[in-house]
From Swiss-Prot:
InterPro entries cross-referenced by the UniProt entry: Ribosomal_uL5, Ribosomal_uL5_bac-type, Ribosomal_uL5_C, Ribosomal_uL5_CS, Ribosomal_uL5_dom_sf, Ribosomal_uL5_N
Annotated Gene Ontology cellular component terms: ribonucleoprotein complex; ribosome
Role played: This is one of the proteins that bind and probably mediate the attachment of the 5S RNA into the large ribosomal subunit, where it forms part of the central protuberance. In the 70S ribosome it contacts protein S13 of the 30S subunit (bridge B1b), connecting the 2 subunits; this bridge is implicated in subunit movement. Contacts the P site tRNA; the 5S rRNA and some of its associated proteins might help stabilize positioning of ribosome-bound tRNAs.
Name of the protein: Large ribosomal subunit protein uL5
GO biological process annotation, one example: translation
Transmembrane segments: none
Keyword match Ribosomal protein: yes
Annotated keywords: Ribonucleoprotein, Ribosomal protein, RNA-binding, rRNA-binding, tRNA-binding
UniProt record similarity statement: Belongs to the universal ribosomal protein uL5 family.
GO-annotated molecular function: rRNA binding; structural constituent of ribosome; tRNA binding
Organism ancestry: Bacteria, Bacillati, Bacillota, Clostridia, Eubacteriales
Length: 179
């Protein structure tokens, strides 16, 4: 059991029951999955760029990402249908908690001028989206080995019904929200 899973069961669940007055322990929202997406626009000209993005994401997430492809051809963007344009990885269970712990305790504090993440990026259904501008904040990525600084989107999918519940869940887990 990971450190964050233990914290969830021992501290977060009782705190959420107290705050929201759940009658059943199964009503307490939990993290369902974390999706990390890396869109690589330059991949349309150079497939090698996509390979390095896949390698970076493999190091960061600890599992191999799946390629994302263009849904339809767009002449203005010079892309064809089914052309690989990025990669994404879906983390669940232990991998998800390991990544969330690493993100909140190590990676986010390494961001330049970090004052906390926005608390307005909830989607209305209890899911939280977070954009990162550079992959260098993760300890697995070596500065000398990267060819280009790339960003990524990280989506926390929870079982919470409202944004308020999801915000409290993530706050109790240790997400550094800006005041």
């Amino acid at each position: 059991m990971t450190r964050l899973q233990e914290k969830y069961q021992k501290e977060v669940v009782p705190a959420m029951i107290e705050k929201f007055g759940y009658k059943n322990i199964m009503e307490v929202p939990k993290l369902e999955k974390i999706v990390i997406n890396m869109g690589v626009g330059e991949a349309k000209e150079n497939q090698k760029v996509l390979e390095s993005a896949v390698n970076d994401l493999t190091l960061i997430a600890g599992q191999k990402p799946v390629l994302t492809r263009a849904k339809k051809s767009v002449a203005n963007f010079k892309i064809r249908e089914n052309m690989p344009l990025g990669c994404k990885v879906t983390l669940r269970k232990a991998n998800m908690f390991e990544f969330a712990d690493k993100l909140m305790s190590i990676a986010l504090p390494r961001v330049r001028d970090f004052r906390g993440v926005s608390s307005k990026a909830f989607d209305g259904r209890g899911n939280y989206s977070l954009g990162i501008k550079e992959q260098l904040i993760f300890p697995e990525i070596e500065y000398d080995k990267i060819d280009k600084v790339r960003g990524m989107d990280i989506i926390f999918v929870t079982t919470a019904n409202t944004d308020e519940e999801a915000r409290e869940l993530l706050r109790f887990l240790g997400m550094p929200f800006a005041q």
